[in-house]
Amino acid sequence: MNSIQLIIDIILILWLLILTVLYLRKKSLNLNIVKNKKIVRAKRYIVFYVIAESKVKGDDLERVVRNSLKDLLGNVWLNIANPKVVTYREDTQEGIISTNRIGYKAVLASLPFAKEINGNKILIVPRRTTGSLKKAKKLIGLK
């Protein structure tokens, strides 16, 4: 009886040892992927225009976009996506929101929830998502 228990214990210890080695190998492979700066820096630029009753300022617009994302998905997704209004043309009511590759869909989903700025009803309409700032600026007529 003791010899059978000893064999079972040895098999379990070997099994746990094998699982630990496989887990540590997988973890070290994932760390190498995260260190790739091209993946970390991947940006997305959302080209949008604003339909509003009166003119809207860029600073107010960024605050409303961040608040709508926070209301929809919470602080965690706000920190992940980190949306910023890079460029905003007040004359044509067009602009560019910068975000990362992970959070751009969350930002797109939260744009309809931005409904009001300083008592002024607004609607933010995304036109296109691009991977380069140069192309985004070209879409709104800059450079």
Swiss-Prot record:
Reaction(s) catalysed (UniProt annotation): Endonucleolytic cleavage of RNA, removing 5'-extranucleotides from tRNA precursor
Source domain of life: Archaea
Compartment(s): Cytoplasm
GO CC annotations on file: cytoplasm; ribonuclease P complex
KW tRNA processing (keyword) present: yes
One GO-annotated biological process of the protein: tRNA 5'-leader removal
Main location: cytoplasm
An annotated Gene Ontology molecular function: ribonuclease P activity
Functional summary from the UniProt entry: Part of ribonuclease P, a protein complex that generates mature tRNA molecules by cleaving their 5'-ends.
Subunit structure as annotated in this protein's UniProt entry: Consists of a catalytic RNA component and at least 4-5 protein subunits.
Name of the protein this chain belongs to: Ribonuclease P protein component 2
Lineage, opening ranks: Archaea, Thermoproteota, Thermoprotei, Sulfolobales, Sulfolobaceae
